[in-house]
Amino acid sequence: MRNKKLRFALKEHHATRLHYDLRLEKNGVAISWAAPKGISMNPQETRLAVRVPDHPLSSLDVEGTRRRGLYGAGEVLTWDKGEYEAFSVDDDNTLTVTLYGEKLRGIFSLRKKLGDNPDWYITKLEDEYSDRKFILVPRLKARKYRGFEPLFELI
């Protein structure tokens, strides 16, 4: 069953470690996953996506620095954004979405690991947007460190 197009964002998050936050608008919140290695456009690469608590819809647009000591502290930038279409979750706990982003386009499968585990796996499905040479390049790079607070510059 197809739904109307809703918003999505992939956030580049330089916290304790660089990771990417996938956010999908649904029922008034942004359902969220933390993806340590981001999302690939290569159908041969499956990436881990750990389900995290839902975020407010405003998290789809937020960029900037969250100060140390707060949940999600660190630098956050939008790596990609756009709309998506979702299909029903099937019996295997798989959510199939079509992303219409600036960089992420086409059909992706999010498959939940069985049991109470928060782990999901995200894979690009083969379509006209697949790119077997895809390399996810961060927008920020660390230039130096003072204690645990990295300073960043745009690449």
Where does each model-flagged region fall?
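A charge-rich, low-complexity, intrinsically flexible signal that marks solvent-exposed coils, linkers
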Residues: 1-155
